Amino acid sequence: MERQLKSIAYAFVANDIDVYIPDGESNCIVVTKLVCKDCGQYWHTSLSECYFCGTLNFYLYECNSCGKKYSLTSSSKSCDTDGCNGKLIKRCSNPECISRTNEEIQRATDEQGGVFDLNSSFNVSLNHCVTCGSKENYYKTYRIYSYRTEVEPNIEALREFANNNKLNSDEDVIIIKHLVDNVIHYGYIPYSKLDETTEITTTFSRFSDLVSELFPVNVPPNVTE
């Protein structure tokens, strides 16, 4: 892999984007991110939610006797409140969850260390987007090619670059690195836009802004990220 493309790969990794090198290809990388189908927010595969109500795991212990909360870093597995000695379990934090309001269900979850105990049958991976609540996700993926220039980007030169590198898919994207007074400016153009575009502008001084363009998040009204 050439140095310019390698630097682009590292920049994507630094912005929490997964990067892969296609078999038998050295002129491009594949970048992908698991996102919500509805709003585009990153789908947090490392998070878990309550089986009963969907509340996120806040990673706290709770005494099953007095209700005192503890950080998971607590070395003790029993409550330190004087005269209590209750057992620390990982309950759902939603006070209206039936794992707290229904005695039979609460007893069943507590016996397994709480809803969020690693060995509990009620501990499930994230099933809802943390931003909009959607249940659908997908991998948004691009095949990335790097084009570096010290002069104003030229559409004809980019078309020739695309032809030489055999770009042919809507997922193929050219990342443009335009060096101006020793300062790098970034731009991009999808293969699908090459024939209809007559002018290229490189408007991003930060690579993270370019990533936000490729993986936009459309926050629904009345929802705060």
From Swiss-Prot:
UniProt effect for mutating residue 39 to A: 10% of wild-type activity
Effect of substituting residue 79 to A: 50% of wild-type activity
Start and end residues, zinc fingers (C4-type): 36-53, 63-84
Gene Ontology molecular functions: type II site-specific deoxyribonuclease activity; zinc ion binding
Keywords tagged on the record: Endonuclease, Hydrolase, Metal-binding, Nuclease, Repeat, Restriction system, Zinc, Zinc-finger
Outcome of swapping residue 66 to A: 50% of wild-type activity
Statement on biotechnological application from the UniProt entry: Could be used to screen carcinogenic mutations in a restriction endonuclease-mediated selective PCR (or REMS-PCR) assay. In particular, could be used to detect the vast majority of mutations that occur at codons 12 or 13 of the Ras oncogenes that encode glycine (codons GGN) at those positions.
EC main group: hydrolase
Effect of residue 36 to A: 10% of wild-type activity
Temperature dependence: Is one of the thermostable restriction enzymes that remain active after 20 to 30 cycles of thermal PCR cycling.
Domain comment (free text): One of the zinc-binding motifs may participate in protein-DNA interactions and the other might mediate protein-protein interactions.
Oligomer and partners: Heterotetramer of two alpha and two beta subunits. The alpha subunit is believed to be responsible for DNA recognition, while the beta subunit is thought to mediate cleavage.
Protein name: Type II restriction enzyme BslI subunit alpha
Species whose genome carries this gene: Bacillus sp. (strain NEB-606)
